[in-house]
Amino acid sequence: MNKIRKGDDIIVLTGRDKGKRGKIALRKDDSYVLVEGINVVKKHTKPNPLKGTVGGIVEKSMPIHQSNVAIFNVATGKADRVGIKLAADGKRVRVYKSSGEEIKVA
């Protein structure tokens, strides 16, 4: 079970985007995540008439390692760690380590 999933609200812990918040758009491989509006780079592209693309400078979000992000706890307003517990029905659920409450994905 992945502790960080698509749709989770996260906060960046290190790097030039430290302190910024966003939602996970995609889990890439096993250890990288793509976050909307975080780690944005400018990509210079050549025009390609065969593909119908116009050349220029395009802004693109790049993946960031999951060790550099933490799940954001809305109740406390801080970054939090994720734990896994067994629910009453026997299913594994993700919980915030600080409060013990279950993490709900919006």
UniProtKB/Swiss-Prot annotation:
Q: Does the keyword rRNA-binding apply?
A: yes
Query: Has keyword Hydrolase?
Result: no
For this UniProt record, give its keywords in alphabetical order, as a comma-separated list.
Ribonucleoprotein, Ribosomal protein, RNA-binding, rRNA-binding
Which GO biological process categories is it annotated with? translation
Q: Name one GO cellular component term.
A: ribonucleoprotein complex
One short Pfam name that applies is ribosomal_L24
Q: Name one GO molecular function term.
A: rRNA binding
Q: How does it assemble?
A: Part of the 50S ribosomal subunit.
> Which family does the similarity line name?
Belongs to the universal ribosomal protein uL24 family.
Biological role stated in the UniProt entry: One of two assembly initiator proteins, it binds directly to the 5'-end of the 23S rRNA, where it nucleates assembly of the 50S subunit. One of the proteins that surrounds the polypeptide exit tunnel on the outside of the subunit.
- What name is this protein filed under? Large ribosomal subunit protein uL24
Q: Which gene encodes it?
A: rplX
